Structures are given as structure tokens and as C-alpha cells.
Amino acid sequence: MSLLEAFAFSSWALGLGLSKVEQFQLSISTEVKKSIDIPCKISSTRFETDVIHWYRQKPNQALEHLIYIVSTKSAARRSMGKTSNKVEARKNSQTLTSILTIKSVEKEDMAVYYCAAWD
């Protein structure tokens, strides 16, 4: 199997500047059909109530909202009209991170992935 240069990352924080969002890996490569985790560190005094949103932008396309997660105890919610289980998001209050998982990566998944946080 050939490697797939899958992702480049950036991040931004919205709201009142209460959350600092960081994605440390600039790119991740994986093999086709493998799953991949994309971490996002959220430095916030209100991590438990921050809403974490995940977006992607494919080359020459508009930014697309994928999924968001409100609580470490609840399931993530997909954008309206999206029913695919290809992506999952979760929050970890011990490490103050959100993880976006992309299942069974295909060449079409190559994009820039962003996380954003606000309360």
C-alpha cells in the first residue's frame, strides 16, 4: 500500500480569547484504509463547557464544518445533513484535547483540517 499524505493543520480560537487552540503536527501521513487521529490542544479555564468544532478545507473548495462536541460525556454531533460515521470527535478533560478520528482514509480525505473552540 502506498502512503497517503493526508493532512496539514492549522487552528484558530473564536470568542473572547478565553481559549487557546493548538495543533502541533503540520502534516500526518497514513496508508489508505487506515484510521487516523488528529489531536487539538485546548488551553482553557472552561474546557468542560467549550464547544469544539472541526472543519476541513479541500484544495480549491470552501471551508466545510464536519462535527462538533460539547461534553466529554456526550456524543459528538455531525453537521446538518451529514449522516456518515467516517469522522468522530471526542474530548479528553485530563489532557485538555479534542481528537478528530477519520476512519478508513481515502485519497479524497486529503485536506487541511481545523479545530476551533468557544463557549
Swiss-Prot record:
Gene3D superfamilies: Immunoglobulins
InterPro entries listed in its UniProt record: Ig-like_dom, Ig-like_dom_sf, Ig-like_fold, Ig_V-set, TRG_var/const_region
Cellular component, GO annotation: external side of plasma membrane; T cell receptor complex
Keyword set, alphabetical order: Adaptive immunity, Cell membrane, Disulfide bond, Immunity, Immunoglobulin domain, Membrane, Receptor, Signal, T cell receptor
Annotated S-S bridges: 40-115
Cleaved signal peptide residues: 1-19
SMART domains (UniProt xref): IGv (SM00406)
Domain Ig-like: 24-119
Domain of life, source organism: Eukaryota
Predominant subcellular localization, coarse grouping: membrane
Keyword Cell membrane listed: yes
Subcellular location field: Cell membrane
Pfam families: V-set
Function comment: Probable non-functional open reading frame (ORF) of V region of the variable domain of T cell receptor (TR) gamma chain. Non-functional ORF generally cannot participate in the synthesis of a productive T cell receptor (TR) chain due to altered V-(D)-J or switch recombination and/or splicing site (at mRNA level) and/or conserved amino acid change (protein level).
Name this polypeptide is given: Probable non-functional T cell receptor gamma variable 10
Organism: Homo sapiens
The organism's taxonomic lineage, starting at the top: Eukaryota, Metazoa, Chordata, Craniata, Vertebrata
